[in-house]
Amino acid sequence: MTILVVTGTGTGVGKTVVCAALASAARQAGIDVAVCKPVQTGTARGDDDLAEVGRLAGVTQLAGLARYPQPMAPAAAAEHAGMALPARDQIVRLIADLDRPGRLTLVEGAGGLLVELAEPGVTLRDVAVDVAAAALVVVTADLGTLNHTKLTLEALAAQQVSCAGLVIGSWPDPPGLVAASNRSALARIATVRAALPAGAASLDAGDFAAMSAAAFDRNWVAGLVG
């Protein structure tokens, strides 16, 4: 059994498509997969990351908890809606209920690592500690990514949360000078597990499956579940 939290250096870096791609690659390797997104914002405009994962990767074990209409940080979205954030133990229980032998459970955060997900002030980093999970960090190839990535990795290390590697959530074709340079530099910071092509979320299920299988190292994926 393995629990892996999927965080990012910020909002809009591609966490959902990375969750879907890793889930797809794992399923193609014969691994049972569940995906959990405890907190979702922006539902009023149709945001539904779990449904997107299901559409792209064919995962049926999908679990969510709190949903807020406005596309804001969870605490702000909850306040705007006159609602509360979930409690820490609710999130931990949601994840624990999914975990079982032979299964890879992916837990997607909201925004970056230190965004408040539960009251009082509980972040995805705290949840990772609670469920003994490593963190896969989704990054960009854009200017500024090196600083954002290092800050995220330092925050993980401060609470002894292992980094399972980096994934570039949107790799341009062709890559420019900055993107190419940053990819090389990111690989010196931590292992880059994959670089997903820009626009991957628009692929149909068959093409997405092929892309996902090619993106990740098969041995690494197979080794995620012991």
UniProtKB/Swiss-Prot annotation:
Subcellular location, in the record's words?
Answer: Cytoplasm
Binding of Mg(2+): at which residues?
T16, D49, E108
Required co-factor? Mg(2+)
Task: Report the Pfam families cross-referenced here.
Answer: AAA_26
- What is catalyzed by this enzyme? (7R,8S)-7,8-diammoniononanoate + CO2 + ATP = (4R,5S)-dethiobiotin + ADP + phosphate + 3 H(+)
A GO cellular-component term linked to this record = cytosol
Instruction: Recite the UniProt keywords alphabetically.
Output: ATP-binding, Biotin biosynthesis, Cytoplasm, Ligase, Magnesium, Metal-binding, Nucleotide-binding
| GO terms, biological process | biotin biosynthetic process
Q: Which residues bind substrate?
A: T41
Major subcellular location class: cytoplasm
InterPro entries assigned? DTB_synth_BioD (IPR004472), P-loop_NTPase (IPR027417)
Query: SUPFAM superfamilies annotated for this entry?
Result: P-loop containing nucleoside triphosphate hydrolases (SSF52540)
The record's EC number reads: 6.3.3.3
- GO MF term set: ATP binding; dethiobiotin synthase activity; magnesium ion binding
Q: Where is the active site?
A: K37
Residue sites binding ATP per the record:
12-17, 49, 108-111, 169-170, 197-199
Give the pathway listed in the UniProt entry for this protein: Cofactor biosynthesis; biotin biosynthesis; biotin from 7,8-diaminononanoate: step 1/2
Name the job this protein performs: Catalyzes a mechanistically unusual reaction, the ATP-dependent insertion of CO2 between the N7 and N8 nitrogen atoms of 7,8-diaminopelargonic acid (DAPA, also called 7,8-diammoniononanoate) to form a ureido ring.
Q: Which family does it belong to?
A: Belongs to the dethiobiotin synthetase family.
Q: Which NCBIfam families match?
A: bioD
Q: Please give the subunit comment from the record.
A: Homodimer.
* Name this polypeptide is given: ATP-dependent dethiobiotin synthetase BioD
| Provenance organism | Mycobacterium bovis (strain ATCC BAA-935 / AF2122/97)
